[in-house]
């Protein structure tokens, strides 16, 4: 058994839509840049909400990134990076187990791996890769939004179709913004039926 290298770690930033996950990832990466550490930031090919080649928060913060589809793509571009940041982990085309293995592989080689993404899908079920990384990470930060219905802390992403909750048999992944999703608390969240 090999011992993880000094300095390698996995940090997870998770939460519902509009909780500030990408904003926090960008904040951490700005610190990395100030510290003059080598880094790569990756964004999924599937996320077409903003400009390609950038991670972008809903509030408008942006950093340059490499657009990729799979963990294999990430590993191919991550050489010599001290820090690897992966935004919107749940949107990658790869098998969740491959995403987890890749993050572990990087961390075991001394890389600081920062991942951000939804912990729950619109059905309030855990995304598989995120579920495993939450258990394996050295640091976990769960962020909260504000429920659009009552103002409490929101932990759920309510997907809407024509103003009504999406049915349970709708596709799990649909990239969208304020026109499709609302942040809701446990009480105001309406389960998919």
UniProtKB/Swiss-Prot annotation:
Enzyme class: transferase
GO aspect biological process, one term: DNA biosynthetic process
Domain of life: Bacteria
InterPro entries: P-loop_NTPase (IPR027417), Thymidine_kinase (IPR001267), Thymidine_kinase_CS (IPR020633)
A GO-annotated cellular component: cytosol
Pfam families noted in UniProt: TK (PF00265)
Protein name per Swiss-Prot or TrEMBL: Thymidine kinase
């Amino acid at each position: 058994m090999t011992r993880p290298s000094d300095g390698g770690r996995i940090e997870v930033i998770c939460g519902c839509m509009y909780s500030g996950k990408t904003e926090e990832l960008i904040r951490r990466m700005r610190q990395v840049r100030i510290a003059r550490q080598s880094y790569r930031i990756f964004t999924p090919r599937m996320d077409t909400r903003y400009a390609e080649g950038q991670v972008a928060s809903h509030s408008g913060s942006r950093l340059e990134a490499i657009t990729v589809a799979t963990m294999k793509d990430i590993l191919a571009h991550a050489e010599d990076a001290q820090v690897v940041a992966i935004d919107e982990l749940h949107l990658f085309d790869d098998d969740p187990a491959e995403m987890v293995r890749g993050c572990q592989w990087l961390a075991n080689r001394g890389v600081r791996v920062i991942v951000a993404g939804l912990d729950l899908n619109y059905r309030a079920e855990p995304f598989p890769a995120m579920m495993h990384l939450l258990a394996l990470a050295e640091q976990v930060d769960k962020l909260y939004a504000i429920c659009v219905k009552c103002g409490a802390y929101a932990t759920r992403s309510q997907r809407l179709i024509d103003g009504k909750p999406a049915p349970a048999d709708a596709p799990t992944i649909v990239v969208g913004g304020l026109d499709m999703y609302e942040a809701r608390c446990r009480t105001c969240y309406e389960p998919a039926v």
